[in-house]
């Protein structure tokens, strides 16, 4: 009986554990619960506008959303496709909201066709798979003929083809997504014919794609802004780049960064695009034009930074000539450009099609000696922004004065930006030559960088400066070493010169010192070459002879103090008069008894 009871208790515990761990799907509007997401969607009482909350757990199913619903999870609901022939989630209704899921496998992670107003946010979508090429397969998210949808803050990775595939879809917002390890393209916007896209693609991070970071094929009027793209290979096809614009017109491509890609900017038959303020770094080919399609023309391509490339422009047919590569203010920055500054911050000779390449021109503008030290003003006279070229670089500055040398580093400067370099060396009185320089190599590269200075003639600057008088604190310290209280009358003057200088200060003091008492007289701050003159009178009011034991210390800040000790007897009703002049040097100390 005891064994039977224990067995029953064990079965109850196991049963309760299973109930507690079971996945739960709840319609907040009807309060009904389900074990499958599709059951909750298909329930007759589930209608447009309902909110379905999906609890933590594994859901093995392919889901069809054919109602305007909100499906939400807290990030712990995992949807595994049961069939690889279908997308894990297929959306066939407008105004659907999908949030907080881990979506694995399927023909696509999420497939949307002929829908509008849907939001896909804060999901992880991975491992969509097809065995060969398909127009609408192997994508993390696939939009077909869909408008005004928002795809944001998703992690999309390890998909056979594209991270996000957008086919003949308009007015969509794709932003703040992280897309990694795409077998095809990170974000692919395309159509079978030219179409008005008006999609916004911004602030996405695309890492490791095979055929392109962001690829536009035939859509027009899209905005591609502030995306970061890294590690895009050519997939063996040769037509690839961080950003690819292929028979796609009137797009704005601005403020994007592409690094470590086979190609930076890939173009083919594009018209009227504005491609400005982008950075392409460590790409094998900075700009390449396809040899297959029509020529690209009337595009604005300026204000971009092409850094550390092997080939600047690949254009075998010369089809990129009919584009606007610069304004009157400047063109693009090319790291391999070797021309010099013309005085306006741009190069003196064209670089391929760019007639006004942006250059770096660091210059020492001025040197000043101040009471606090030496100041050197450094300015970037070029129109290239060093912060964009290498935001982590340090620029070496060297300053020398007399026999002292000071070396330091400054942060990169934007175009036209100045910075003050301060050296806390106090320049003494008199004339001194100060030299400041921005070191560079024989080829004109700034030391410690891969940045060429387009005008080294202004990298060195010397200036004769007048030093400053250094004010120091003057003090007199008196100590009564005797056993009697004494009263001292002190007349103190400050002179500009120890011998015959002008008097600049005068004080009369009466000081009483008890036995073993010390008092300090603060005289103020004066140039260290000034002198202190003091006349001290000590009177003996007694009718008896008394001993006088007194220590006097004259001190100028930073110089050796001078001390005198007086030990003598004072006559009855007599006085002792002591006169001294102090300059801070032993030979300048004179006393009279």
Curated annotation (Swiss-Prot):
BP terms from Gene Ontology: cell wall organization
Keywords in alphabetical order: Cell wall, Cell wall biogenesis/degradation, Glycoprotein, S-layer, Secreted, Signal
Self-association state and partner proteins as the record states: Assemble into mono-layered crystalline arrays.
Location, primary (coarse class): secreted
Superkingdom assignment: Archaea
Keyword Transcription applies: no
Residue positions with a glycan: 29, 58, 66, 74, 114, 122, 145, 148, 158, 176, 208, 231, 326, 336, 340, 431, 471, 500, 516
Native source organism of the sequence: Methanothermus sociabilis
Protein name, UniProt field: Cell surface glycoprotein
Pfam families from the UniProt entry: NosD
PTM field: Glycosylated.
Keyword Signal annotated: yes
Gene Ontology, cellular component aspect: extracellular region; S-layer
Secretion signal, residue range per the UniProt entry: 1-22
Compartment(s) where it occurs, according to its Swiss-Prot or TrEMBL record: Secreted, Cell wall, S-layer
């Amino acid at each position: 009986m005891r064994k039977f009871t224990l067995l029953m208790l064990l079965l109850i515990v196991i049963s309760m554990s299973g109930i507690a761990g079971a996945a739960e799907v709840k319609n907040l509007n009807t309060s009904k619960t389900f074990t499958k997401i599709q059951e909750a969607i298909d329930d007759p009482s589930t209608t447009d506008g309902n909110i379905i909350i999906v609890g933590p757990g594994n859901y093995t199913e392919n889901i069809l959303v054919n109602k305007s619903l909100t499906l939400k999870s807290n990030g712990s609901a995992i949807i595994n496709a049961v069939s690889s022939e279908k997308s894990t989630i297929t959306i066939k209704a407008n105004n659907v909201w999908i949030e907080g899921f881990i979506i694995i496998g399927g023909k696509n992670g999420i497939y949307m066709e002929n829908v509008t107003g849907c939001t896909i946010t804060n999901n992880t979508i991975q491992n969509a798979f097809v065995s060969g090429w398909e127009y609408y397969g192997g994508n993390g998210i696939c939009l077909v003929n869909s408008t005004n949808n928002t795809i944001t803050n998703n992690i999309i990775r390890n998909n056979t083809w594209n991270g996000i595939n957008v086919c003949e879809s308009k007015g969509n917002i794709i932003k703040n997504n992280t897309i990694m390890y795409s077998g095809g393209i990170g974000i692919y916007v395309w159509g079978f014919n030219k179409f008005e896209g008006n999609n916004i693609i911004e602030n996405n991070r695309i890492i490791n794609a095979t055929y392109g970071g962001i690829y536009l094929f035939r859509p027009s009027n899209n905005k591609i802004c502030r995306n970061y793209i890294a590690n895009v290979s050519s997939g063996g096809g040769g037509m690839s780049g961080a950003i690819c614009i292929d028979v796609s017109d009137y797009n704005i491509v601005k403020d994007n960064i592409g690094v470590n890609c086979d190609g930076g900017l890939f173009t083919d038959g594009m018209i009227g695009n504005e491609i400005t303020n982008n950075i392409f770094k460590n790409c094998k080919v900075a700009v390449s034009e396809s040899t297959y399609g029509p020529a690209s023309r009337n595009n604005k391509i300026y204000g971009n930074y092409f850094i550390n490339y092997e080939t600047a422009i690949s254009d075998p047919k010369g089809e990129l000539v009919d584009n606007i590569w610069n304004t009157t203010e400047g063109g693009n920055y090319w790291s391999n450009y070797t021309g010099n500054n013309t005085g306006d911050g741009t190069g003196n000779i064209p670089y391929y099609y760019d007639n006004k390449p942006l250059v770096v021109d660091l210059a020492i503008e001025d040197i000043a000696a101040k009471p606090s030290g030496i100041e050197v003003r450094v300015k970037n006279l070029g129109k290239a922004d060093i912060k964009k070229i290498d935001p982590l670089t340090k620029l070496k500055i060297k300053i020398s004065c007399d026999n002292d040398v000071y070396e330091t580093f400054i942060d990169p400067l934007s175009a036209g930006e100045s910075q003050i370099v301060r050296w806390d060396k106090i320049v003494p009185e008199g004339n001194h030559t100060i030299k400041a320089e921005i070191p560079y190599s024989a080829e004109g590269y700034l030391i410690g960088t891969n940045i060429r200075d387009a005008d080294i003639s202004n990298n060195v600057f010397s200036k004769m400066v007048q030093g400053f008088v250094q004010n120091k604190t003057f003090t007199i310290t008196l100590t009564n070493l005797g056993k009697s209280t004494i009263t001292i009358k002190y007349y103190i003057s400050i002179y500009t010169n120890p011998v015959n200088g002008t008097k600049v200060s005068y004080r009369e003091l009466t000081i009483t010192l008890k036995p073993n008492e010390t008092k300090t007289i603060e005289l103020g701050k004066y140039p260290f070459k000034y002198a202190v003159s003091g006349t001290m009178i000590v009177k003996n009011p007694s009718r008896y002879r008394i001993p006088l034991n007194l220590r006097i210390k004259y001190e100028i800040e930073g110089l050796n103090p001078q001390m005198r000790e007086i030990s003598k007897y004072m006559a009855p009703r007599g006085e002792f008069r002591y006169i001294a002049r102090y300059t801070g040097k032993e030979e300048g100390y004179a006393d009279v008894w």
